[in-house]
Amino acid sequence: KMKTVKNELLNKSSNIFDNYDMKREEGENDSHICSMIRNDSVEEFISYVTRSNYSLSSQITPSIYETNSFILERKDTTLIEYSAFFGSIQIFQYLMMKGVELAASLWLYVIHSNSAELIHMLETHHVLQPKFENKSETEFNRPNHEYLRCLTESIKCHHNDFADYFENNFLFQEEKDPKQKEAIIANCIKYHNYYYLETETIKEHGFFYLHLYKYNELFNLLLKE
């Protein structure tokens, strides 16, 4: 079976196992175009896409060496999303200048980059924020609920400056309903980001998640209070 898988991979790319140990240690997409994007080599990138007539709206080719869970979960990551993820500002600007679509998903990729400059670009171009997947409109029906998706992704990444920005500017306390507060606390607990956790908040919204994510000592301690 292993031989069959190896042959299938070789059929897709004859040099896929070149420098195997080094690529496996790096844990990143080994394609040339992805390497250029990560390094923000804009001149080389422009020359490459022009020479090869490469579609600027195309998706990156998945790699067996990729280890980042966010990228792995998204099989349709585009060139501009990949540049946003790595904070490659020059290539991002080039793709934007060439009219590549600025999709709502870019917010999540930019949050991972921790680039305030890219956040500002999305705002300047009025890029819509992403909504929660598999959630009906009625579940998060308060004003600016789209920003809650950005807030929870910031919490996941431990990019608390971004989390503060989204909460203080777009998710005012009086606008939050219990489901929104619960979503924030759930992500804090799940991703071990304790920046927003307070005892009273946990008591009100977090007991289930303490138990779910195996915070047994804290769960028992609060239960006794």
Language model segments and positions:
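Ankyrin-repeat boundary/"N-cap" motif
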Residues: 26-33, 57-81, 101-111, 132-153, ...
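Leucine-rich solenoid repeat scaffolds
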Residues: 151-167
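N-terminal capping/linker segments that flank leucine-rich repeat
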Residues: 2-46, 184-186
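Repeat-mediated protein-protein interaction surfaces in helical alpha-solenoids
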Residues: 4-20, 49-68, 89-93, 191-196
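Ankyrin repeat domain, specifically the short helix-to-loop turn at the C-terminus of the second helix
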Residues: 47-63, 93-101, 120-129, 167-173, ...
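Conserved ankyrin/ankyrin-like repeat signature
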Residues: 44, 90-91, 117-118, 161-162, ...
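Short, intrinsically disordered, charge-balanced linker/junction segments flanking boundaries
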Residues: 129, 133, 191, 207-209, ...
